[in-house]
Amino acid sequence: MDPMEYIVPNRKRLPYGMMNFAVIRREDYYYVDKTRFIPMIEQADRFFFFIRPRRFGKSLTLNVLQHYYDVRTRDKFNDLFGDLYIGKHPTANRNSYLVLYLNFSGITGELNDYRKGLDAHCSITFMNFCKRYADLLPPETLEELRQVNGAVEQLDYLYQACERAGQKMYLFIDEYDHFTNAILSDAKSLHRYTDETHGEGYLRAFFNKVKAGTYSSIERCFITGVSPVTMDDLTSGFNIGTNYSLTPQFNQMMGFTEEEVREMLTYYSCLLYTSPSPRDMR
């Protein structure tokens, strides 16, 4: 049987695997509105940890927040959010930050030499940040950044540049535990886990620098990953954030509820047999 027989024509496409909120909205993909959680996030700790398994929408959630808070997307607010919850109930902080987004899952390189990968990834990201906000930062920022070596030192320089310009930053880190999960999956490298997350480890040093930014130009920070293990071991290095992964009020922020799935199936007129839920069988 043709799978298309299960779908009524002229319906919105499903954004499977997509993480670009602007494209989803601009090209009218099906989108489950989770923006009601934005005011709740603002009421929570300024430094927000959230752990969920893979394929739960973590990256898309961060992308939504980036578009909401970025000063560069102010003129697109109505197009992106106008008919969503947050478009009808905007907060005072919308489109008010310089946004720095780091995705550690995109770092390539050999496991035993990940520091070069981290440095390279951060260097490119930091330079793009300087170009994106060139008119809001001191004019020498990009050229001076190029003279600084290493992710930790470059991040420190960005703090100084933002502080000199009187700008506040919203830092997003996606898959913060990418390195350590890779280390833990390799029995030959297990000893390196302690080396990197304790003492003078490079990853620990990086998160210590993130912590330092919270006293200067980082106004808010949102960090996601798939495991709490690394976070626990880095806690003393980044001990001002709050883990909201098990907080009931945020349970529905990522992933789909049963009601949302049923609504989606109804929208697509799926003629699929679904076994009754325990509630229906009572």
Can you describe what each PLM-predicted range is?
Residues 172, 220-226:
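Structural recognition of the conserved hydrophobic beta-strand(s) that form the central parallel beta-sheet
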Residues 80-127:
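P-loop NTPase motor core
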Residues 230-244:
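Short regulatory helix/loop adjacent to the ATP-binding pocket of P-loop NTPases
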Residues 158, 162, 192-218:
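Substrate-engagement module of ASCE P-loop NTPases
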Residues 3-69, 73, 78-87:
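Walker A/P-loop-proximal flanking segment of P-loop NTPase domains
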Residues 250-272:
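Conserved small helical "lid"/interfacial subdomain of P-loop NTPases
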